[in-house]
């Protein structure tokens, strides 16, 4: 089965979801971040927990690291963190505190030499987050246009020892309308790197379709708070 990585998005140590990455669409989730981690601990099919520091992503500096350390202590499952990671010191701090993988976005996209250096220092432990409105890459908490096409960016990082590529179609994110299967499949075909799909995933049928097109893992946000999503999963 496709790997399942449920997401916990944080603003001020509160678990929230946004729609299309718009900060004014913030909705507090019924389960707290702590409750979510404990809930996901029950499922063998969850092989990683995906944490995003939303204000960190917007403000270009890690904000939630102390709270994320508390969440880390609640689970033995691998944990990855993204949002506001712009320097080696932040990566070192997360890794030293038991975080297994870090997600690089804006800094890596704007400074490929730095990204190359970091991936050499931490091979297969860094993931590049490519967040796009359809094919146009967005940066700084999805609020600015990077002036790049996702496939051009993918080609530029193909030789780097990344753990994989996390692709989010912003136009789908938080809507529970299904992921962008077409572009996701094109990305799978365009790279040797694992592609992780994010944004819009609704149910197990979406997971099955993503698996059928070669997606390595699925990051599930809003749907993971629906009881029906978990029916039949162990």
Swiss-Prot record:
SUPFAM superfamilies: Ribulose-phoshate binding barrel. One of its GO terms (molecular function) is 1-(5-phosphoribosyl)-5-[(5-phosphoribosylamino)methylideneamino]imidazole-4-carboxamide isomerase activity. It is found in: Cytoplasm. GO terms for cellular component: cytoplasm. Pathway: Amino-acid biosynthesis; L-histidine biosynthesis; L-histidine from 5-phospho-alpha-D-ribose 1-diphosphate: step 4/9. Its EC number is 5.3.1.16. It catalyses: 1-(5-phospho-beta-D-ribosyl)-5-[(5-phospho-beta-D-ribosylamino)methylideneamino]imidazole-4-carboxamide = 5-[(5-phospho-1-deoxy-D-ribulos-1-ylimino)methylamino]-1-(5-phospho-beta-D-ribosyl)imidazole-4-carboxamide. Its main location: cytoplasm. Keywords: Amino-acid biosynthesis, Cytoplasm, Histidine biosynthesis, Isomerase. HAMAP family: HisA. This is 1-(5-phosphoribosyl)-5-[(5-phosphoribosylamino)methylideneamino] imidazole-4-carboxamide isomerase. It comes from Staphylococcus saprophyticus subsp. saprophyticus (strain ATCC 15305 / DSM 20229 / NCIMB 8711 / NCTC 7292 / S-41).
